[in-house]
Protein backbone atom coordinates (compact mmCIF):
# COMPACT_ATOMS: atom_id res chain seq x y z
CA UNK A 1 0.00 0.00 0.00
CA UNK A 2 1.26 3.55 -0.67
CA UNK A 3 2.47 5.43 2.37
CA UNK A 4 0.11 8.20 3.53
CA UNK A 5 1.17 11.76 2.88
CA UNK A 6 2.04 13.27 6.30
CA UNK A 7 0.72 16.64 5.13
CA UNK A 8 -2.82 15.28 4.90
CA UNK A 9 -5.19 16.83 7.39
CA UNK A 10 -3.30 20.11 7.58
CA UNK A 11 -0.11 18.78 9.15
CA UNK A 12 3.13 20.68 8.47
CA UNK A 13 6.79 20.03 9.35
CA UNK A 14 7.47 21.07 12.93
CA UNK A 15 10.78 22.57 11.83
CA UNK A 16 8.90 25.58 10.44
CA UNK A 17 8.17 26.73 14.00
CA UNK A 18 11.88 27.16 14.63
CA UNK A 19 12.07 29.96 12.10
CA UNK A 20 9.65 32.62 10.90
CA UNK A 21 6.73 30.21 11.30
CA UNK A 22 6.76 30.78 15.06
CA UNK A 23 5.15 34.20 14.55
CA UNK A 24 1.83 32.83 13.35
CA UNK A 25 1.69 30.29 16.17
CA UNK A 26 2.39 32.91 18.83
CA UNK A 27 -0.17 35.26 17.28
CA UNK A 28 -2.86 32.57 17.41
CA UNK A 29 -1.89 31.63 20.97
CA UNK A 30 -2.21 35.26 22.01
CA UNK A 31 -5.58 35.55 20.30
CA UNK A 32 -6.93 32.55 22.17
CA UNK A 33 -5.55 33.80 25.49
CA UNK A 34 -6.65 37.37 24.93
CA UNK A 35 -3.14 38.72 25.55
CA UNK A 36 -2.02 39.58 22.03
CA UNK A 37 1.16 38.24 20.36
CA UNK A 38 3.68 39.35 22.98
CA UNK A 39 5.94 37.76 25.59
CA UNK A 40 3.12 36.04 27.50
CA UNK A 41 1.79 34.35 24.38
CA UNK A 42 5.30 33.42 23.24
CA UNK A 43 6.15 31.85 26.60
CA UNK A 44 2.85 29.97 26.68
CA UNK A 45 3.28 28.71 23.12
CA UNK A 46 6.78 27.42 23.93
CA UNK A 47 5.58 25.75 27.12
CA UNK A 48 2.69 24.08 25.32
CA UNK A 49 4.85 22.69 22.56
CA UNK A 50 7.47 21.48 25.04
CA UNK A 51 4.71 19.64 26.91
CA UNK A 52 3.62 17.79 23.78
CA UNK A 53 7.18 16.84 22.90
CA UNK A 54 8.08 15.57 26.37
CA UNK A 55 4.81 13.63 26.63
CA UNK A 56 5.47 11.83 23.36
CA UNK A 57 9.10 11.00 24.08
CA UNK A 58 8.76 10.17 27.79
CA UNK A 59 5.72 7.97 27.25
CA UNK A 60 7.56 5.93 24.62
CA UNK A 61 10.62 5.63 26.84
CA UNK A 62 8.76 4.64 29.99
CA UNK A 63 6.20 2.31 28.44
CA UNK A 64 7.99 1.04 25.36
CA UNK A 65 11.67 1.18 26.36
CA UNK A 66 12.49 3.20 23.22
CA UNK A 67 12.72 6.85 22.28
CA UNK A 68 11.49 7.65 18.76
CA UNK A 69 13.53 9.72 16.37
CA UNK A 70 11.72 13.05 16.61
CA UNK A 71 13.93 14.99 14.22
CA UNK A 72 12.28 18.34 13.36
CA UNK A 73 12.17 17.30 9.72
CA UNK A 74 10.38 14.04 10.56
CA UNK A 75 7.82 15.29 13.08
CA UNK A 76 4.71 17.09 11.81
CA UNK A 77 2.26 19.37 13.60
CA UNK A 78 -1.07 21.10 13.23
CA UNK A 79 -3.08 23.51 15.33
CA UNK A 80 -6.71 22.41 15.78
CA UNK A 81 -9.50 24.94 16.16
CA UNK A 82 -9.43 24.31 19.92
CA UNK A 83 -7.01 22.59 22.25
CA UNK A 84 -3.26 21.99 22.13
CA UNK A 85 -0.97 21.39 19.18
CA UNK A 86 -1.32 17.94 17.61
CA UNK A 87 1.77 15.99 16.52
CA UNK A 88 2.19 13.29 13.90
CA UNK A 89 5.22 11.06 13.36
CA UNK A 90 5.15 9.08 10.09
CA UNK A 91 7.20 5.88 9.98
CA UNK A 92 8.55 6.00 13.55
CA UNK A 93 11.98 4.56 14.24
CA UNK A 94 13.90 4.36 17.53
CA UNK A 95 16.95 6.39 18.43
CA UNK A 96 20.00 4.36 19.43
CA UNK A 97 21.68 4.63 22.80
CA UNK A 98 20.66 4.63 26.48
CA UNK A 99 17.21 6.01 27.24
CA UNK A 100 18.35 9.09 29.21
CA UNK A 101 20.71 10.22 26.47
CA UNK A 102 18.21 9.45 23.71
CA UNK A 103 15.54 11.51 25.50
CA UNK A 104 17.93 14.42 25.88
CA UNK A 105 18.91 14.32 22.21
CA UNK A 106 15.38 13.85 20.91
CA UNK A 107 13.74 16.70 22.81
CA UNK A 108 16.22 19.03 24.55
CA UNK A 109 18.73 19.16 21.70
CA UNK A 110 16.52 18.45 18.70
CA UNK A 111 13.61 20.73 19.58
CA UNK A 112 13.87 22.81 22.73
CA UNK A 113 17.16 24.45 21.75
CA UNK A 114 15.99 25.75 18.34
CA UNK A 115 12.56 26.61 19.77
CA UNK A 116 14.16 28.66 22.55
CA UNK A 117 16.29 30.48 20.01
CA UNK A 118 13.26 31.30 17.86
CA UNK A 119 11.15 32.51 20.78
CA UNK A 120 13.91 34.29 22.67
CA UNK A 121 15.25 36.20 19.71
CA UNK A 122 11.84 37.38 18.51
CA UNK A 123 9.95 38.02 21.75
CA UNK A 124 12.64 38.79 24.34
CA UNK A 125 11.65 35.90 26.60
CA UNK A 126 14.65 35.19 28.81
CA UNK A 127 16.58 31.90 28.59
CA UNK A 128 15.85 31.32 32.29
CA UNK A 129 12.10 31.49 31.69
CA UNK A 130 12.33 29.20 28.66
CA UNK A 131 14.39 26.63 30.56
CA UNK A 132 11.89 26.76 33.41
CA UNK A 133 9.06 26.24 30.95
CA UNK A 134 10.82 23.20 29.51
CA UNK A 135 11.26 21.75 33.00
CA UNK A 136 7.62 22.41 33.93
CA UNK A 137 6.57 20.72 30.71
CA UNK A 138 8.63 17.65 31.56
CA UNK A 139 7.17 17.41 35.05
CA UNK A 140 3.68 17.88 33.65
CA UNK A 141 4.32 15.04 31.23
CA UNK A 142 5.39 12.63 33.96
CA UNK A 143 2.48 13.73 36.16
CA UNK A 144 -0.05 12.83 33.47
CA UNK A 145 1.81 9.61 32.65
CA UNK A 146 1.74 8.42 36.26
CA UNK A 147 -1.93 9.31 36.61
CA UNK A 148 -2.70 7.02 33.67
CA UNK A 149 0.01 4.37 34.20
CA UNK A 150 1.32 4.40 37.79
CA UNK A 151 3.30 1.25 37.06
CA UNK A 152 5.59 3.36 34.86
CA UNK A 153 7.02 5.25 37.84
CA UNK A 154 10.01 2.95 38.23
CA UNK A 155 11.32 3.90 34.81
CA UNK A 156 9.80 7.36 34.26
CA UNK A 157 10.81 9.10 37.49
CA UNK A 158 14.55 8.31 37.24
CA UNK A 159 14.50 9.56 33.65
CA UNK A 160 12.90 12.83 34.73
CA UNK A 161 15.35 13.22 37.61
CA UNK A 162 18.24 12.67 35.21
CA UNK A 163 16.97 15.28 32.76
CA UNK A 164 16.31 17.82 35.52
CA UNK A 165 19.85 17.30 36.78
CA UNK A 166 21.63 18.23 33.56
CA UNK A 167 21.65 21.26 31.27
CA UNK A 168 19.49 22.84 30.04
CA UNK A 169 17.04 21.92 32.82
CA UNK A 170 19.43 21.85 35.78
CA UNK A 171 18.66 24.34 38.58
CA UNK A 172 15.26 25.25 37.14
CA UNK A 173 13.31 24.16 40.22
CA UNK A 174 12.72 21.61 42.96
CA UNK A 175 11.26 18.23 41.97
CA UNK A 176 9.71 15.79 44.45
CA UNK A 177 8.21 12.36 43.87
CA UNK A 178 6.51 10.36 46.60
CA UNK A 179 5.06 6.96 45.85
CA UNK A 180 1.30 7.07 46.10
CA UNK A 181 1.22 10.87 46.21
CA UNK A 182 2.57 11.75 42.77
CA UNK A 183 5.02 14.47 41.79
CA UNK A 184 5.48 18.13 42.65
CA UNK A 185 7.65 20.85 41.17
CA UNK A 186 8.32 24.42 42.23
CA UNK A 187 9.99 26.63 39.65
CA UNK A 188 12.75 29.16 40.15
CA UNK A 189 11.53 31.31 37.26
CA UNK A 190 8.16 32.65 36.14
CA UNK A 191 6.38 31.50 32.98
CA UNK A 192 4.57 34.90 32.78
CA UNK A 193 1.16 33.24 32.97
CA UNK A 194 0.32 35.38 36.00
CA UNK A 195 -0.27 38.22 33.53
CA UNK A 196 -3.38 36.43 32.32
CA UNK A 197 -6.22 37.69 34.58
CA UNK A 198 -6.72 35.50 37.67
CA UNK A 199 -4.28 32.83 36.49
CA UNK A 200 -1.02 31.26 37.65
CA UNK A 201 0.56 27.99 36.53
CA UNK A 202 0.62 24.86 38.67
CA UNK A 203 4.35 25.16 39.38
CA UNK A 204 4.21 28.90 40.09
CA UNK A 205 7.22 30.40 41.85
CA UNK A 206 5.08 33.39 42.86
CA UNK A 207 2.89 31.23 45.10
CA UNK A 208 5.95 30.23 47.09
CA UNK A 209 7.08 33.83 47.37
CA UNK A 210 3.64 34.90 48.56
CA UNK A 211 3.69 32.29 51.33
CA UNK A 212 7.07 33.56 52.51
CA UNK A 213 5.91 37.18 52.86
CA UNK A 214 5.16 38.24 56.44
CA UNK A 215 1.55 39.08 57.13
CA UNK A 216 0.73 42.64 58.12
What are these regions (language model features)?
Residues 1-20, 210-216:
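Actinobacteria-biased recognition of intrinsically disordered, low-complexity terminal regions
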Residues 187-209:
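Local cysteine-cluster metal-coordination motifs and their immediate loop/turn environment
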Residues 12-181:
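Hydrophobic, aromatic-lined core segments that form the binding pocket/scaffold
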Residues 184:
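Conserved functional hotspots at enzyme active or ligand-binding sites that engage polyanionic ligands
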Amino acid sequence: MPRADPSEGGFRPLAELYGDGIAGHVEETGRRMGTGPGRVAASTAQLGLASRLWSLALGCAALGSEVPDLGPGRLWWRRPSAGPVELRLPAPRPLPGPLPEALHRAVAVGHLAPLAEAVGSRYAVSPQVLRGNAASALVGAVRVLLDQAPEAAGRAVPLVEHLLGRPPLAHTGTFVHEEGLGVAFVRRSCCLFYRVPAETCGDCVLRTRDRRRPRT
